[in-house]
Amino acid sequence: MAVNLKLTRAIKDRIVQNFQLNGSVLLINFVDGSMMAVTIAKCNSPPLQEGARIRQISEDQTKLLFECEDHSTLDVTIVDPGNSVIFRDKNNQVEYLG
């Protein structure tokens, strides 16, 4: 699986504050006020824990793998590659769309 450099640059070192799975939408809020929404088909792992620091994001077509500094991971299948992830900063400005 290749590292998604653009998404990794946007969220690397951000710390998870809250993790919610609402139907097919995964919401991750970070302690700095930024947030990520991912439209998923399924989630294949336990949720990220509060306080987890994002190390990198890898992707292979419909698979997205979040890797954290504490070695925890989140493996999800996205619905529409290139159109399933949005990351916004604390001012609600889009930093990543894909």
Would you name each region that the model predicts?
Residues M1-G98:
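Surface-exposed, interaction-prone regions used to assemble/regulate multi-protein complexes
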